[in-house]
Amino acid sequence: MTILAIVIFLLTLTFVIWQPKGLDIGITALIGAVVAIITGVVSLSDVLEVTGIVWNATLTFVAVILISLILDEIGFFEWSAIHMVKASNGNGLKMFVFIMLLGAIVAAFFANDGAALILTPIVLAMVRNLGFNQKVIFPFIIASGFIADTTSLPLIVSNLVNIVSADYFDIGFIEYFSRMIIPNIFSLIASILVLWLYFRKSIPKTFDTENLSDPKSAIKDSKLFKLSWIVLAVLLVGYLVSEFIQIPVSIIAGIIAFIFVILARKSKAVHTKQVIKGAPWNIVVFSIGMYLVVFGLKNVGITTILGDVLTNISNYGLFSSIMGMGFIAAFLSSIMNNMPTVLIDAIAIGQSSATGILKEGMVYANVIGSDLGPKITPIGSLATLLWLHVLTQKGVKISWGTYFKTGIIITIPVLFVTLLGLYLTLIIF
């Protein structure tokens, strides 16, 4: 049964990453789950348990992406990006930093996928419009994609991984934020410094802003644009009070997304049917299916082995617990995708004998490792694979070798600094 559970997991994961002939990840994960149920690797009671773990996370994610797609249609992100470039006053380094700051803000509120897949094409079009050559374009593109994941830590909704882990360990919105805001700031500063050091020779000292369009020209519907600020303010308030009124974040985000879609239907700038169709609905099926397959590993005792490793690491204190868990999560995410990794690690943490602050440190370190680790390899997250595909369609080909060489050099120091930020947070506050 152990070998069967491992084979089902590896085959499912391979087809999810490979996606032969455009095979949908939801269908692949569903097939893997059905095989696991038929063979007895998982039971029907596991189906209910897994659904209970992932429903809030996946529906929140879909709602947040829906909101971001509407904002993209009305030119909200393009307007923001043009403002950032204008604020740099023709200084290449300032523009590089400002684009990353924008990416961090977008990632925090609209999830890492929203930041990477929506902002990167806008940045690409903008730097091309400014007349930058391929050597100069590359750093801005990598920075846009990299910052989307490394700064997707501060809020539960900033990354699907965050929501899954917070739900699994019953962590509230404000409690989560209080633990992760400082690590996120550490990650942002480290990301900017490391990316600048890596690309400093390619970033132009100055650039001509004459070809830069007026920010107002990016806005496709001024009325909906103004309304969007109110929608976002209500959304943020909803997130903050959700913990106190005991309402799942998905309900808050879902209601706001529904209202926004209704408002957008009246706009000529927004193709609501296309937006709804473009939302990642397959993530719901994928999450349930993939996590059922992961539960198969738990049922045959694979996660217990990892739990024992974590118990041994926790014996060396908080610093070792955080660093060990963070780097284990990052490594596993880079080779087998962060979605199954975060749950495998969460189960293992629960099965370990770590308690109190040691367990808390591991819980958040797992999130950090699962958020940042995927930047090491192209297969680390589904968003990265899609991001590379979008860039290829737009004429920017980044080979897996180039990505890995860049990713591993940039990610490791940022991961260490971010985990250090978590350690300092837990011992000081």
UniProtKB/Swiss-Prot annotation:
GO terms for molecular function: arsenite transmembrane transporter activity. The chain crosses the membrane at residues 3-23, 25-45, 50-70, 98-118, 136-156, 179-199, 222-242, 244-264, 275-295, 316-336, 372-392, 408-428. Involved in arsenical resistance. Thought to form the channel of an arsenite pump. One of its GO terms (cellular component) is plasma membrane. The lineage of its organism: Bacteria, Bacillati, Bacillota, Bacilli, Bacillales. InterPro entries: Arsenical_pump_ArsB (IPR000802). Keywords: Arsenical resistance, Cell membrane, Membrane, Plasmid, Transmembrane, Transmembrane helix, Transport. It comes from the Bacteria. It is a multi-pass membrane protein. The keyword Transport applies. The keyword rRNA-binding does not apply. The gene is arsB. It is found in: Cell membrane. One of its GO terms (biological process) is response to arsenic-containing substance. This is Arsenical pump membrane protein. Belongs to the ArsB family.
